[in-house]
Amino acid sequence: MARGPKKHLKRVAAPKHWMLDKLTGVFAPRPSTGPHKLRECLPLIIFLRNRLKYALTGDEVKKICMQRFIKVDGKVRTDITYPAGFMDVISIEKTGENFRLIYDVKGRFTVHRITNEEAKYKLCKVKKILIGTKGIPHLVTHDARTIRYPDPMIKANDTVRIDLETGKITEFIKFDTGNLCMVTGGANLGRIGVITNRERHPGSFDVVHVKDSTGNSFATRLSNIFVIGKGNKAWVSIPRGKGIRLTIAEERDKRLAAKQSSS
């Protein structure tokens, strides 16, 4: 009989995008409970040790975190298994570096460095709007923030820009055709394109059609769409590759061209 929450995570069962190899151990760090789901997050230990290579072991990561060097969304985090997720800003004051967790076209979190100016805000997708006690309107975002008294124009699936210092909404983008979006789940994870149309299926999943900058079209569920800009202008900087997924043949040609130019 299971008693209470699970405390372990086997390496083989860890999300593939963490890119842990099978043979270096039995266990993987199990993310703490937090604003992002286990399968959609990147624990700080993996970001600092496996991605940035700032530490060799988990103990070293703990020593870095306990010196209060690491901030996520402007708050100091000392838990090495804290689940950082999509659009989170990780700041390391000691080195003056800022990173935003964003997917690459292969669906993995990429080490995406950003400027100090861009590190002051983040984008959040509105999950739902509800009326709380005493008729106070609330808005719940994808990273579990609850914001009271939002602009009455903001609806579910829109994107809000949040100032990390105050936690207040500064601007918002409507979920609308012609806006730039990123896919945050499913087979097209990490692709970026412009919303062309939305198919409504009452009682089932709404389907959104997206067209990327090379003219390729694809469709995904509404729940996987995260609006990141108005028109073609993104509100956050986009990692290398610009969210365009190449076919295997195109990737091969690109590799060969790079090889020839270097030789």
Curated annotation (Swiss-Prot):
Q: State one molecular function term (GO).
A: rRNA binding
Cite the Pfam families for this sequence. 40S_S4_C, KOW, Ribosomal_S4e, RS4NT, S4
Gene Ontology BP, a term: translation
Which parts of the sequence belong to the S4 RNA-binding domain?
42-104
Q: Which domain of life is it from?
A: Eukaryota
InterPro entries given in the database record: KOW, Rib_uL2_dom2, Ribosomal_eS4, Ribosomal_eS4_C, Ribosomal_eS4_central_region, Ribosomal_eS4_central_sf, Ribosomal_eS4_KOW, Ribosomal_eS4_N
Arranged from A to Z, the UniProt key words for this protein are: Ribonucleoprotein, Ribosomal protein, RNA-binding, rRNA-binding
Output a single Gene Ontology CC term carried by this record.
cytosolic small ribosomal subunit
Which family does the record assign? Belongs to the eukaryotic ribosomal protein eS4 family.
Official protein name in the record: Small ribosomal subunit protein eS4
